[in-house]
Regions:
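Flexible, glycine-rich beta-alpha linker
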Residues: 1-19, 96-100, 200-201, 243-255, ...
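NAD(P)H/NAD(P)+-dependent Rossmann-fold oxidoreductase cores
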Residues: 9-242, 297-316
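Acyl-thioester-processing domains in fatty-acid/polyketide/NRPS systems
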Residues: 15-27, 309-457
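Structural preference for long, well-ordered alpha-helical segments in enzyme cores
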Residues: 73, 77-81, 215, 226, ...
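Phosphate-handling active-site elements
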Residues: 88, 272-279, 417-425
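Active-site-adjacent bridging/hinge elements
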Residues: 195, 235-242, 292-294, 378-394
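Active-site helix of classical SDR
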Residues: 258-259
Length: 457
């Protein structure tokens, strides 16, 4: 499957031809954009933070609106934002506003096993047969109440103002009412953090329609309701919580993946539709220590898939840093090793390498194409023989043939031209000569050269 995005002005005939080309080739790419400047796709690259403070100034005058505030991860992030700003926070969640003196919350913090026993006995006392699933549901409700209370208390400790709104985010009228109340008291919203989400994993064929709608609407309908309510009022930044499931897809999470990707595309549109608002989508990997992914067999499954769980101390400051240190990109992936999510499904990147005719019009440094992928780029392999190539036979160190540095540069130039035949090489910059490539005993050696596209923001 592929998604192909064309400019609205593209003529139908050319569009049809390109769609056919996309169907027949380049199976390693699933998202493609096409305009007059060329063909574009999306890849991953690591971008270090520079620690600058060119982003938003968060202070006691700042106004935050946060959805999904009763989630343990969101609660921890709110606490971090509050400590850095002392701002005003409007917290939205389906969970009822927690009472500071709730004994269940206190017991959840001090002795979770004792709380489970209490819940079990309460269910029995009500005349029902207590099951582990019933206990876990009640415990999850108390856990969300504790997370909401923790967020409120963290804001208050930082000298900020916490306003908690219990609201069904899939109810457009209810969300509009809450947002109208918020906007009646403030002339702007500095930061919207849309972090609400529900994840119910089932294969699409086995998933009831109402379940799909719930998972999708918590993110999408809530977003529409909130943005309609904000209208043309100032909004400094909108941060949406997406997932690696939204970026890469995941089995049994079609609805969750689609909803997350929808939010990402919404904030990406801000560059044209709302340029005064900074949009940021964070594709989180699974968190370790807190959150939904810590339960049951999920950590074991993640390890088997080669996916690192995100340590809370690494993940919690991300939102604050992205807001205050200025934009690097509209969409970022936060995680460690991503395992199967970024694995190459075809060793050659979908190319029929045996059918590629390199022709005779190339230099001595290109042999045969080995493969092509987003992660590794275009790779060629060539065999060099000191007995056949004079530039090796005549270039020796202590009698051993050594690949001349200039021929290494020639390999780069030849491969770049193969990758982009409509361009020419103008210069080679930042070359480093780290170690000699030697041909011991005058024997042939195989050389692999890889070319990757430079990232474009």
């Amino acid at each position: 499957c592929k998604v192909v995005d064309f400019a609205a002005s593209r003529k139908t005939a050319a569009l049809a031809e390109q769609l056919i080309d996309e169907t027949l080739g380049d199976p390693g790419v699933v998202e493609v954009g096409s305009d007059d400047a060329g063909r574009w796709t999306i890849g991953l690259r690591e971008v270090p933070r520079d620690g600058s403070d060119t982003g938003l100034a968060l202070n006691s005058d700042s106004v935050f609106v946060v959805t999904g505030a009763a989630g343990s991860i969101v609660s921890a992030i709110v606490a971090d934002l509050a400590a850095a700003s002392g701002a005003t926070f409007h917290l939205l969640d389906l969970a009822a506003k927690p009472a500071a003196n709730d004994p269940d919350i206190a017991l959840f913090v001090s002795d979770r096993d004792a709380l489970k026993r209490n819940i079990f006995e309460r269910i029995k006392a009500g005349g029902e047969r207590a099951t582990p699933a019933m206990v876990d549901r009640e415990l999850a409700s108390i856990e969300r109440a504790e997370a909401a209370l923790s967020a409120i208390q963290a804001i208050e400790r930082a000298g900020g103002n916490a306003h908690y709104h219990s609201v069904d985010l899939t109810n457009s009228d209810a969300v509009t009412t809450v947002m109208s109340e918020i906007l009646a008291n403030h002339d702007r919203i500095d930061v919207l953090v849309h972090a609400a989400g529900v994840e119910i994993s089932h294969m699409l064929a086995d998933k009831p329609r109402e379940q799909f709608d719930l998972v999708f609407d918590v993110k999408s309908s809530a977003w529409h309701s909130i943005m309609r309510a904000i209208g043309d009022k100032p909004l400094g930044a909108a941060v949406v919580f997406s997932s690696v499931a939204g970026r890469f897809g995941n089995g049994g999470q079609t609805d969750y993946s689609a909803a997350n990707d929808f939010l990402t595309k919404c904030v990406m549109s801000f560059s044209n539709a709302r340029p005064e608002t900074r949009g940021l989508a964070i594709d989180w990997t699974a968190w370790g220590g807190i959150g939904m992914a810590t339960r049951g067999s999920i950590p074991t499954m993640m390890a088997a898939a080669g996916i690192d769980m995100l340590p809370p101390q690494v993940g919690i400051p991300v939102v604050r840093r992205e807001l205050t240190e200025g934009p690097i990109a509209t969409e970022i992936v936060v995680g460690g090793r991503l395992g199967v999510l970024t694995a190459e499904w075809d060793e050659a990147g979908g190319l029929d390498v045996g059918a590629i005719d390199m022709g005779d019009e190339h230099g001595p440094m290109l042999g045969r194409v080995v493969g092509m992928s987003l992660a590794k780029g275009l790779t060629v392999e060539t065999e060099l023989d000191p007995e056949a190539q004079a530039f090796l036979y005549d270039h020796r160190i202590d009698g051993t043939p050594v690949l001349p540095g200039v021929m290494g540069l020639e390999a780069f130039a030849e491969l770049a031209t193969l990758l982009l035949p409509e361009h020419h090489v103008e210069s080679i910059d930042n070359a480093q000569f780290l170690a000699p490539f030697k041909f011991y005993r005058n024997e042939p050696r195989k050389l692999r050269v890889t070319a990757q596209f430079a990232g474009v923001d």
